[in-house]
């Protein structure tokens, strides 16, 4: 059975922390592919934010060297609000017999019970969780306790041993705006940023 991982995010810009956790996701779950899903709308209020087309281009460039990585624009081309459940449904229709895995940070796990159709979502996809520094499963809201306990036991939720890297896209954008450079960006994406004058003041 094919295993497909789904990794949504703003990727504004994509950075080495994203690639690190995507590789850990693929390795630990044994995925055939990890599909990066750049979000559509303008999620940042500051002006130094890249367009959906630029973010998509940067993700495509940054992921090109790993054959397991793919990129989808499905969250960009959909009009209006995009919800994880709807995104997963698109992939379920495309790959009806595949085992789907959704990657989320532990901060998202703590709020999962507030997501649209979350109980239907977790029936359609397995969940891989990357723990952020300082987070613990003991902090999980009681609304999720029964589901999480059962899912950890049956393997439909996996906690990755690799933690979420403490890299901030906000800080990267700030450094690019003030200094024109920032550590932690894949070289191909950094070149694109320079060539297109992204994140300048």
Swiss-Prot record:
Which EC number applies?
2.7.7.18
Q: Which family does it belong to?
A: Belongs to the NadD family.
Q: Which Pfam families match?
A: CTP_transf_like
InterPro entries, alphabetized:
Cyt_trans-like, NadD/NMNAT, Rossmann-like_a/b/a_fold
Pathway note: Cofactor biosynthesis; NAD(+) biosynthesis; deamido-NAD(+) from nicotinate D-ribonucleotide: step 1/1
In the record, biological process GO terms are:
NAD biosynthetic process
Molecular function GO terms recorded = ATP binding; nicotinate-nucleotide adenylyltransferase activity
List all membrane-crossing ranges: none
Q: Which UniProt keywords apply?
A: ATP-binding, NAD, Nucleotide-binding, Nucleotidyltransferase, Pyridine nucleotide biosynthesis, Transferase
The chemistry this enzyme catalyses reads:
nicotinate beta-D-ribonucleotide + ATP + H(+) = deamido-NAD(+) + diphosphate
From the Swiss-Prot or TrEMBL record, give the protein name.
Answer: Probable nicotinate-nucleotide adenylyltransferase
Instruction: Summarize the protein's role.
Output: Catalyzes the reversible adenylation of nicotinate mononucleotide (NaMN) to nicotinic acid adenine dinucleotide (NaAD).
PANTHER family from the UniProt entry: NICOTINATE-NUCLEOTIDE ADENYLYLTRANSFERASE-RELATED (PTHR39321), PHOSPHOPANTETHEINE ADENYLYLTRANSFERASE (PTHR39321:SF3)
Record organism = Neisseria meningitidis serogroup C / serotype 2a (strain ATCC 700532 / DSM 15464 / FAM18)
